[in-house]
Amino acid sequence: MASLVYSPFTLSTSKAEHLSSLTNSTKHSFLRKKHRSTKPAKSFFKVKSAVSGNGLFTQTNPEVRRIVPIKRDNVPTVKIVYVVLEAQYQSSLSEAVQSLNKTSRFASYEVVGYLVEELRDKNTYNNFCEDLKDANIFIGSLIFVEELAIKVKDAVEKERDRMDAVLVFPSMPEVMRLNKLGSFSMSQLGQSKSPFFQLFKRKKQGSAGFADSMLKLVRTLPKVLKYLPSDKAQDARLYILSLQFWLGGSPDNLQNFVKMISGSYVPALKGVKIEYSDPVLFLDTGIWHPLAPTMYDDVKEYWNWYDTRRDTNDSLKRKDATVVGLVLQRSHIVTGDDSHYVAVIMELEARGAKVVPIFAGGLDFSGPVEKYFVDPVSKQPIVNSAVSLTGFALVGGPARQDHPRAIEALKKLDVPYLVAVPLVFQTTEEWLNSTLGLHPIQVALQVALPELDGAMEPIVFAGRDPRTGKSHALHKRVEQLCIRAIRWGELKRKTKAEKKLAITVFSFPPDKGNVGTAAYLNVFASIFSVLRDLKRDGYNVEGLPENAETLIEEIIHDKEAQFSSPNLNVAYKMGVREYQDLTPYANALEENWGKPPGNLNSDGENLLVYGKAYGNVFIGVQPTFGYEGDPMRLLFSKSASPHHGFAAYYSYVEKIFKADAVLHFGTHGSLEFMPGKQVGMSDACFPDSLIGNIPNVYYYAANNPSEATIAKRRSYANTISYLTPPAENAGLYKGLKQLSELISSYQSLKDTGRGPQIVSSIISTAKQCNLDKDVDLPDEGLELSPKDRDSVVGKVYSKIMEIESRLLPCGLHVIGEPPSAMEAVATLVNIAALDRPEDEISALPSILAECVGREIEDVYRGSDKGILSDVELLKEITDASRGAVSAFVEKTTNSKGQVVDVSDKLTSLLGFGINEPWVEYLSNTKFYRANRDKLRTVFGFLGECLKLVVMDNELGSLMQALEGKYVEPGPGGDPIRNPKVLPTGKNIHALDPQAIPTTAAMASAKIVVERLVERQKLENEGKYPETIALVLWGTDNIKTYGESLGQVLWMIGVRPIADTFGRVNRVEPVSLEELGRPRIDVVVNCSGVFRDLFINQMNLLDRAIKMVAELDEPVEQNFVRKHALEQAEALGIDIREAATRVFSNASGSYSANISLAVENSSWNDEKQLQDMYLSRKSFAFDSDAPGAGMAEKKQVFEMALSTAEVTFQNLDSSEISLTDVSHYFDSDPTNLVQSLRKDKKKPSSYIADTTTANAQVRTLSETVRLDARTKLLNPKWYEGMMSSGYEGVREIEKRLSNTVGWSATSGQVDNWVYEEANSTFIQDEEMLNRLMNTNPNSFRKMLQTFLEANGRGYWDTSAENIEKLKELYSQVEDKIEGIDR
């Protein structure tokens, strides 16, 4: 452990002496000489870890945070209490006061300090309040978290009038208003018209601008003072001087600050003349190097000094040496808390990189970046990569950020941008011991927010000394950071011809039929497109085949390979000794996998690396996780690890192939999900060890920002988004199409006497299509009244329109291929279907409904009820929307069907009258009176969206990344909900985790919850559900800005409260009167990805649920309290622990692994799956110990689940539905809940579908049927997949396998689904042969899945069908073996 810490008492003597000499040589005139002891520190790592206590922050030792006054006769004591964000001020102020106490004859000072985050702890806050009771002076700085700002305000406000002085420097307005010095007060902050007070109104415009305005105020003091009343001028002057002292931050400045304030305002010192010096001012921005004689404001002067240094090695003298720019906080420099900065600079230079370390005194670093990193004449960067060591966003720091300004500066700089993390709210030991890694607050402020600027690589490089609160470098982490920064910089410097690239593809589950697994991506067609582009651009891609099909064959089985293999093509055989030499952590894998080589990716003697090289490009197949065949091992292995073959692959890529970069191709592999800390990894975490020093570029689906963020944080990836296939309407086929025609006939002929016969045909055909499972149908229609006939037809029509209009992605995307015109139409129609009040854009269907005197919501409701006239009107609105958008797009389409020249076309289209194609189209429909102004607004918006849809930057961004350039960041999510996701090719990020749920998300959440509750009441004799077990997904909450999170809050009856910055850190209970129903208990299963990204919101949820459990309300109106009291008594625990309801995996672990068992058929019975779920998902988050990680609470979990009457999940976008991925059934507890309930009653299972403007709540079985009809059994979908060949067959097989997963976890799949699938893919000889010949391995898995569904009792079919499946299985086995031979 000690080797991680880069400080004199843990280094070798020579290293310590070297650093000591460096330190002594870096003293500046503004820093007093400090003695550094070379004696070993006693019990350096024996401070009690917070992880074993309440999980909050370990407070620094008394000698730092509490200075006891020296008692002298007749010398008054002055007590100062302070609260600061940054620990460097704590140590600097302590040093200043300790020195003052030794020399002062006029006063003795008692100082008590708190870091702002410490005030979350109840006991610490109480101590703070007690300390304030006899304090003379209070100081606060950088208090920007609202809940803590309120706590500080409440405590200080009580003592403000009594205290002699209250000084608050840049913080939230409610804290700033506490300021008072004599007659100077800020209690009316923001209400005065004077320039001084108007300054603070800028707080709302952004904290970075606010802080920089304060600095400007300091520089322009004389001008400001003339606007102040004369009686306040002197006190205001002293406040400004205080700010100057504080920003100066050095012990000398802070000592003079204490002298000035105490001498001016403490009554006991009135009449005593206390001398103090003026503040020593430093550059607001500049360049600082620990060996330089001064700070520099000019880059040329800095280089003049740098190039004349005599202490540099030969590497630094090379003109082509890599140059790394560093961004530093001035406060660390001026307070002397800079040893971690020194360590990074020294490490970079020792490795041959030149360094330009810049700093800023405010919160906006964009100006210094442009000023010092970019040549003012050529506008070219003078650095090859940039690393921020602040740990904060480039503009705004820990307060309100200005990401557009940051992005603009970084685009001008155009180099890779890394943000490393110094531990601010944890000590080193806390971080090392924590399974979470970084504390939730640090993740939000120091990881999530910089990512919005385009930052990568959140490597923890500095810790905090628990004795002094000062920073120290973590040596191994500093090495990792510096090497990676240099490697990113080398991409800028190296020629294309010499760069080596390792493209990594995935195969999951492991099988030849699955090589090239990636969500919605035709992997090999895309790789071929990338390689062709690389070759044209000057990269060495020797031997590239002529097409993607040949490329697949060569990767799977190269006939001319050096090594023969029955599996994939072997690129390299690695002997055990070589593997151990190249893989320092190989021994750590032996606990789980034994001695190498093991039996995975091995021939028994060597470890095998699968793939093939084409010149300087290697295409390799990432080994699988290793537990696929035996997922039950994960139940018993507390220290899961990659296997030797997995480690060998990455050792080969880095140290034998010597890749300059690795490109992980598609969503997603296993690297980022390997065991280790959630965020802020150590060198003992497997993702960190595996990726080593290779720059990582990762193509990730634009609709999956949550897992992309995991890849960004845990595998240090520069994630580049790719488009998912644009959604199309499912359409109708076979009997469903016939039904549509019959309904059209009925509408035309119902009054001619043929109505009853047509209705009878509709009923008969609907039953043949199995719609009687969804619609209550009579036996026949002859005896029905006209009203009842309309009702039956309306309900059937509504159901088939639901199927027809269902959105689905057809086919697979190819990198670099823009959408066709028709694909653009489908996307734009769906974009137009949503209201966007924030942009004052009405939904197109709403505009059309309005012009015929209807509200679109009424039409939706009527259609849902099966009212025939409303179903027909909705169909007309839908058709008119498509037609109008098609007419618009056709004007921008060439003869090949591609969208071109959007900008020029739009200019001519957005005129008036007949030139507008949508007006022309609608003039021939019943909607000819639609509001033209509203139409013009929505089509103007669609025109902008169209430009984004057809823009292709996926290849361009990859080239930028490989050339060491900045890839512009952008949000991930659903492009229909949020068109800002487009164009793809962005460095994908999530969102500020503290910004959800938004107000709009809460409004949507309430609608869904009320519909869910009403539906359950309808089917449960009018009773409210007492408990709902539900799932929170990371991606869903990013796409919807927290809708499902909001659903949980509304179920229990609380509302989120946002602070000034829009951050949600508090909740308040909604009264039972307003709620109008009982508070419903919840059991929340958070996905591992949600846990990683939104642990602050898990904290919020847990606090909210426990708050509700403690409300003094009748238990029949508060089911949370009812169950918590029952469980507390049953388990002998307190009510807060019994109210634990927020669960997930253990830290660093993901999924229930039921999907692994199902995909590999490696389970015996459903109880085994249920045991896996309980073992993997019973880890609870505790808001009373937020830094302690996830703790196993299986008993509480089981008891909470046993009360559930409803299980519930959300679908939020058209791209991913229940059977598209295994995640949904992997997290479904339906059968488990049934087994835990005392009455053994199966809970109701519901799915909320918010993929369209008309949100629905369906049963699970209804949703599975809808999914089967629109995808698996739909020719439009499966033919679209077949057009992608090899990979398309795998997609079809995956849907069938996931359907079996739903049978296993819920029993909600109808027999006819399997029967129809068998008819579609097996009984059809032509289809059967296409599947077998295109991808025999995946077809074999499909046959196996059918047989398994029958064997497990999920599918009852004829003996003939089973016999045919067995015969086909034998045939395909022979075919595969023939291919292999």
UniProtKB/Swiss-Prot annotation:
Taxonomic source organism: Arabidopsis thaliana
GO molecular function per UniProt: ATP binding; magnesium chelatase activity; mRNA binding
N-acetylalanine PTM positions: A50
Gene name of the encoded protein: CHLH
Reactions this protein catalyses: protoporphyrin IX + Mg(2+) + ATP + H2O = Mg-protoporphyrin IX + ADP + phosphate + 3 H(+)
Subcellular location: Plastid, Chloroplast stroma; Plastid, Chloroplast membrane
Record's note on what induces expression: By red, far-red and blue light. Down-regulated by white light.
Protein name stated in the entry: Magnesium-chelatase subunit ChlH, chloroplastic
Coarse class of the protein's main subcellular location: plastid
Keywords of the record: Acetylation, ATP-binding, Chlorophyll biosynthesis, Chloroplast, Ligase, Membrane, Nucleotide-binding, Photosynthesis, Plastid, Transit peptide
